[in-house]
Amino acid sequence: GISIGALAIAEHIPEITSKILCKAIESIQLPMKAYEPDGGGFEGPTYWDYGSRYNVFFLDALENSLGTDFGLGSMEGFRRSGDFQIQLSATNLMCFNFSDSDVKAMSTAQHFWMGKRYDQARYSGFRYMALKRGVEANILDLLWFDDRFKNFDLNSMPLDKYFRVAEIVTMRDSWDNGKGFSVALKGGSSTRVH
């Protein structure tokens, strides 16, 4: 938030803005590295929504204001993290709730932004499908809406996914059957995070 505010008034206080942005670019890398190597996170899909939302705000603000995100958006784990919430959704879109996540159907507008940014049809296609199924929309959907993949075939996505460091595996029998079978398992230490 403070970084985006600094960008808004950068022409008036360039030295202070520069210091704020340098520190922000350095410090945001730590939470972004938590998605390494394959996009999985130690906390649940609700926290992915929260964390990725503010990452996307920051990256988008840098790109739109300065023409670069200084390589932050190319961090492999973050780039692939759009799969995390998707894969943790059951065929009826209910989330696998671990680590204080909500038990609800979930999809977020960040999928539109990530779909455009990383040219990933499945990110935008999943969000488009979730909105059609009644998942709550928000103002960011208007800002980042991407209908290029509205006809994306969800069944082209893998049915199973293993997030290595986060020790989460998901399995399903299909993507488009709202009553289909799906399961997710979380391994790891009970002393980690929540």
Where are these regions (language model features)?
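Extended polysaccharide-engagement surfaces of secreted carbohydrate-active enzymes
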Residues: F42-H194
